[in-house]
Regions:
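Helix-turn-helix DNA-binding module
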Residues: 1, 121-132, 136, 140-160, ...
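N-terminal module of bacterial RNA polymerase sigma factors
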Residues: 1-28, 35, 145-146, 167, ...
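C-terminal edge and immediately downstream basic/flexible tail or linker adjoining helix-turn-helix-like DNA-binding
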Residues: 5, 9, 91, 112-113, ...
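Conserved RNAP core-binding helix
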Residues: 6, 22, 30, 40-57, ...
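Sigma70-family region 2
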Residues: 11-12, 38, 48-66, 85-87
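Structural recognition of an alpha-helix C-terminal capping motif at a helix-to-coil junction
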Residues: 31, 45-52, 65-77
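Arg/Lys-rich amphipathic alpha helix in sigma70-family domain 2
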Residues: 56-63, 73-93, 112
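Internal acidic/polar
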Residues: 89-112, 116
């Protein structure tokens, strides 16, 4: 309900509403973009560009539907476009660069540092379609149905990509496959 109210306020010219939308969704969008691009700077650029496009499309916005799903889908689509354009080599990521949807405690950062590094490396090795399904489902909390609708795919295709991605991640993290 708050999202509909924010959209209506934003359509009427409230910059405070846009700021609130940004504050509310920036972390999850950054987590999605980083999970797909494996590059913090590129992820920040994607989130910035999505918000600029969002702000410029105020008159076209509809208060119906999930704003979170809309923004994370826009983020995933732009990240996909950037991946296609860049065709860059994946690299080892410093877990300190990785944005999380929720800020971890210092103790959990210390305990999970190596695991995060291994997970980032393994995630970067997945085919893009599988990585996208995994990131959208786990980091953006999107349902398979919402992902399928946003990408114009069948729900079975999305579930298969997710399942294959999770299986490959599990194999890589258990040392069964080389990254």
């Amino acid at each position: 309900m708050e999202d509909r109210w924010l959209i209506l306020r934003f359509k009427r010219g409230s910059t405070d509403a846009l700021c609130r939308i940004y504050e509310k969704y920036e972390r999850v969008m950054l987590a999605v973009a980083f999970g797909l691009l494996n590059d913090r700077s590129a992820a920040e650029d994607v989130v910035h560009d999505v918000f600029v496009a969002f702000a410029q499309s105020a008159e076209k916005l509809s208060p119906a539907g999930s704003l979170r799903s809309y923004l994370t889908t826009c983020t995933a689509n732009l990240a996909r476009d950037r991946c296609r354009a860049i065709k860059r080599q994946s690299h080892i990521v410093d877990p300190a660069q990785a944005p999380n949807a929720e800020a971890p405690s210092p103790l959990s950062e210390v305990l999970q540092g190596e695991q995060l590094r291994q997970l980032s490396d393994a995630l970067a090795q997945l085919p893009y379609e599988q990585r996208e399904a995994v990131v959208l489902h786990l980091k953006a909390d999107m349902t398979f149905r919402a992902i399928a609708r946003a990408q114009g795919l069948s729900i079975n295709t999305v579930q298969s990509r997710y399942r294959y991605g999770i299986e490959k991640l599990r194999s890589m993290l258990n040392g069964e496959l080389e990254p």
